[in-house]
UniProtKB/Swiss-Prot annotation:
The cysteine framework is III (CC-C-C-CC). Classified in the M-1 branch, since 1 residue stands between the fourth and the fifth cysteine residues. Residues 1-24 form the signal peptide. It is found in: Secreted. The lineage of its organism: Eukaryota, Metazoa, Spiralia, Lophotrochozoa, Mollusca. GO terms for molecular function: ion channel inhibitor activity; toxin activity. Its main location: secreted. Expressed by the venom duct. It comes from Conus bullatus (Bubble cone). GO terms for cellular component: extracellular region. This is Conotoxin Bu15. The keyword Cytoplasm does not apply. Disulfide bonds join 51-65, 52-63, 57-66. Residues 25-43 form a propeptide. Belongs to the conotoxin M superfamily. Keywords: Disulfide bond, Ion channel impairing toxin, Neurotoxin, Secreted, Signal, Toxin.
Amino acid sequence: MLKMGVLLFTFLVLFPLATLQLDADQPVERYADNKQDLNPDERMIFLFGGCCRMSSCQPPPVCNCCAKQDLNPDER
């Protein structure tokens, strides 16, 4: 009878508590919420990780990346 009580307690109380997700266990949602306020060009830089080489760069209508590199550090 004691074994049955321990088994029921484990599956009816402890197992559901272990499977609950707390708010702190979801960092991906907070990260996505922070990134949704950025404009699409800034998000593309995060996705691609960088810029083209200056020697192979196209004029600014095509390549926004090099145009941003030409800005003063205070304007970025």
